[in-house]
């Protein structure tokens, strides 16, 4: 049975000559698990919103969308709400009530469900998701993973035929992300619910899906099972080559491999076959760099609580060298965001000491600290935007720079080009994709030219191609003496590009070392490349390192 049938669909946003979607022909069958991927701005979110009438964007539309044989526009609000679920990137935007129980009942109440039937459905879905112990909890007290699970449970209580997810794991740490995707897969396989997911983070989801659909500039360039991806795509398409799971990327470079592994387990088996009877060179681990450094930020003995019931930071201490890219990792609710909020001055320091560039943070005036010394790229970067167009935002950011109008305009143009948003300057900040907004927020921060930049999940919603550009920007900043401190769940990015990695657990910094040592000494919280190859190359933590060592072993 066909859930969605899309015929020759094209769409462009108001005022834009460029198609956001072009000539889309797509059939989505009942019970399929479909992943839609593509670089930022390729049309993923636009396509998903087209499948949900209430969220469909305004603009020039041609073609046809059918849901179970009915045209999309002929669906009543009741039919759409009850049959098509939609999970947003950020669960904060989807929860509307105060407690878990009222959140679960909200959708059912709007559908006019009878009280007895409602109680049964809530009891059933709570048991299925093991929510019984948090039913009376406030939604605001839940972790990111719990909130995302609650949003899903609330939708499933309405018994939909299809559920659409727009980058549902972008706010989650790697372990919470994997657990959430396994839950979604179980729902699809055991209950026949159609699942359509847009994702940049493909490591955990590729092995689960029936089809991988890749968009590029609004057009479908590939639609197949991941194992049937054309080798030519890996050679000719930079996005495919950069964004697939580590085992696929590693072994796509070896002509001896005829079927690419999707998982770490398959990757290990493939590696064993590839290196069978070969002399494997085990590189010696690098010695730690213990040189005395100047510190941009020093925190010592910091304690912090939001409600006086539980300390989020417990005797927290951290030293961040000047001019380095310093990555902070850890699970959701470990205290990472609180730590950088205190170290940047966004939260008031009550207990402990924090020095910024050698001076007590309490001695800084706000006008001296923010902008000139410290800038913060928050996780919810939409809070940085208040103008009607991106161009207005960027011009406002340089008005106080002391530059002439001509110089201001030149700096805005250069920064827009660097962050790849030149073609978006006439757009409203809220009309662009999550990845594009992340790039625009980075442009705002760069225009301020601070000495220390704090970033909270900077690669969230960012495609694999721009991550490389992002890393280059960060390296240039650090080479010029600027310190970049990033909270991140992106283990591959941190392993490849950071200078130091710290791990926060239960409000304390547990370790702080070079990325190679950090990830090679971890067993669970490490990269897929390391998990794939550690039996052969225990110190290799990036795709590049594993590939180079494999090639070296094959030549020996």
Question: Where do the model's predicted regions map?
Answer:
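Conserved ABC transporter NBD signature motif
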Residues: 60-71, 352-360, 370
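Conserved ABC ATPase signature
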Residues: 138-142, 428-432, 436
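ABC ATPase nucleotide-binding domains
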Residues: 231-294, 525-556
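H-loop/switch region of ABC-family ATPase nucleotide-binding domains
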Residues: 199-200, 488-489
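Conserved ABC ATPase "signature" region
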Residues: 116-134, 395, 406-424
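Helix-to-loop junction immediately C-terminal to a conserved catalytic motif
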Residues: 52, 344
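Catalytic Walker B motif of ABC-type/P-loop ATPase nucleotide-binding domains
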Residues: 163-166, 453-456
């Amino acid at each position: 049975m066909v859930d969605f049938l899309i015929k020759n669909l094209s769409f462009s946003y108001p005022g834009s000559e460029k198609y956001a979607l072009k000539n889309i022909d797509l059939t989505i069958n009942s019970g399929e698990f479909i992943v839609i991927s593509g670089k930022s701005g390729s049309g993923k979110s636009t396509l998903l919103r087209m499948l949900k009438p209430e969220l469909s964007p305004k603009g020039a539309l041609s073609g046809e969308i059918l849901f179970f044989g009915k045209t999309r526009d002929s669906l009543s609000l009741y039919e759409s709400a009850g049959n098509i679920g939609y999970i947003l990137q950020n669960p904060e935007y989807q929860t509307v009530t105060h407690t878990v129980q009222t959140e679960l009942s909200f959708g059912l109440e709007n559908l006019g469900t009878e009280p007895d039937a409602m109680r049964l459905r809530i009891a059933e879905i709570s048991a299925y998701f093991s929510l019984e112990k948090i039913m009376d909890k406030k939604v605001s007290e839940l972790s990111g993973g719990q909130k995302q699970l609650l949003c899903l449970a609330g939708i499933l209580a309405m018994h939909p035929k299809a559920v659409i997810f727009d980058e549902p794991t972008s706010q989650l740490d790697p372990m919470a992300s994997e657990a959430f995707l396994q839950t979604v897969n179980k729902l699809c396989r055991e209950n026949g619910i159609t699942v359509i997911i847009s994702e940049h983070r493909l490591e955990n989801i590729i092995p689960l899906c029936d089809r991988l659909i890749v968009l590029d500039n609004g057009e479908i360039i590939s639609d197949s099972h991941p194992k049937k991806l054309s080798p030519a795509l890996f050679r000719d398409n930079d996005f495919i080559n950069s964004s697939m799971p580590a085992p696929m990327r590693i072994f796509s470079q070896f002509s001896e491999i005829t079927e690419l592994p999707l998982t770490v387990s398959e990757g290990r088996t493939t590696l064993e076959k590839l290196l069978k009877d070969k002399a494997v060179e085990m590189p010696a681990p690098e010695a730690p760099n213990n040189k005395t450094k100047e510190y941009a930020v020093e925190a010592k003995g910091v304690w912090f609580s939001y409600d006086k019931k539980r300390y989020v930071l417990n005797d927290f201490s951290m030293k961040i060298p000047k001019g380095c890219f310093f990555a902070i990792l850890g699970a959701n609710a470990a205290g990472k965001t609180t730590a950088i909020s205190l170290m940047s001055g966004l939260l008031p320091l009550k207990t402990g000491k924090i020095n910024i560039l050698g001076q007590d943070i309490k001695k800084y005036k706000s006008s001296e600290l923010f902008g000139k010394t410290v800038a913060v790229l928050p996780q919810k970067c939409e809070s940085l935007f208040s103008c009607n167009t991106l161009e207005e935002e960027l011009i406002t950011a340089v008005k106080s720079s002391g530059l002439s109008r001509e110089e201001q305009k030149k700096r805005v143009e250069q920064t827009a080009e660097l962050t790849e948003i030149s073609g978006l300057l006439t757009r409203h900040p809220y009309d662009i994709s999550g990845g594009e907004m992340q790039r625009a927020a980075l442009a705002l921060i760069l225009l301020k030219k601070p000495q220390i930049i704090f970033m909270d999940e900077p690669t969230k919603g960012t495609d694999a191609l721009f991550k490389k550009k992002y890393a280059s920007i960060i390296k240039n900043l650090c080479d010029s003496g600027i310190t970049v401190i990033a909270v991140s769940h992106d283990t591959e990015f941190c392993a490849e590009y950071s200078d130091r990695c710290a791990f926060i657990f239960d409000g304390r910094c547990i370790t702080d070392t070079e990325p190679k040592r950090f990830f090679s000494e971890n067993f669970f919280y490490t990269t897929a490349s390391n998990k794939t190859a550690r039996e052969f190359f225990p110190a290799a933590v990036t795709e590049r390192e594993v590939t180079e060592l494999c090639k070296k072993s094959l030549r020996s």
